[in-house]
């Protein structure tokens, strides 16, 4: 599959857009564009979707920093014994599907993103296709706090100089015949919760 990166976007618009090259922790170089207007941002995102429209779906992720380009699922952040974490997680998921009546009707590929949506740590990454939602997450910092063995997530304004919106390309463009809202590719899977579940499951 051919993935097309956005190059020379600063030359495609009359706006004052700055492009810098950043080397990620993995050694790969990426372009980071400084964009100051929603109009330019919308054009930038649209261009990224356009040049990848044959084999990829481009979605968005708002972040307060780049984290060296690492997109690590919440289940594995700060962890080293990944096999052990995965085994415990698999057992927990199987127990939930078996014992929680509301969830028994849903396949695991749909249940996991739902739980991720409500703050449970899973191997999934949250992505959106709405620029305003991505901007909100880019402008707000999340903080976890544990009280009486319960973990709470608080959001507060990002005080950093820059906020980031990542364009994430997935090759999961083929809709599964037997699973509404589930798309599969060679390297990735994508679950659109708006199609996979009734709306009363989804928080604002």
Each model region followed by its residue ranges:
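Catalytic-core elements of nucleic-acid end-processing and repair enzymes
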Residues: 1-204
């Amino acid at each position: 599959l051919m993935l097309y990166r956005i190059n020379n976007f600063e030359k495609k618009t009359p706006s004052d857009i700055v492009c810098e090259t950043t080397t990620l922790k993995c050694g790969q170089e990426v372009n980071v564009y400084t964009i100051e207007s929603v109009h330019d941002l919308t054009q930038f995102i649209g261009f990224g979707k356009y040049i990848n429209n044959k084999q990829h779906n481009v979605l968005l992720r708002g972040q307060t920093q780049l984290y060296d380009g690492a997109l690590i699922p919440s289940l594995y952040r700060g962890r080293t014994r990944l096999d052990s974490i995965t085994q415990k997680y698999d057992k927990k998921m199987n127990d939930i599907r078996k014992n929680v009546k509301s969830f028994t009707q849903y396949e695991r590929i749909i249940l996991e993103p739902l739980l991720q949506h409500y703050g449970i740590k899973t191997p999934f990454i949250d992505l959106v296709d709405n620029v305003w939602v991505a901007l909100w997450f880019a402008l707000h910092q999340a903080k976890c706090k544990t009280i009486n063995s319960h973990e709470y997530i608080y959001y507060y304004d990002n005080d950093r100089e820059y906020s980031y919106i990542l364009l994430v390309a997935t090759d999961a463009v083929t809709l599964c015949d037997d699973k509404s809202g589930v798309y599969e590719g060679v390297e990735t899977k994508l679950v659109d919760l708006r199609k996979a579940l009734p709306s009363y499951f989804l928080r604002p």
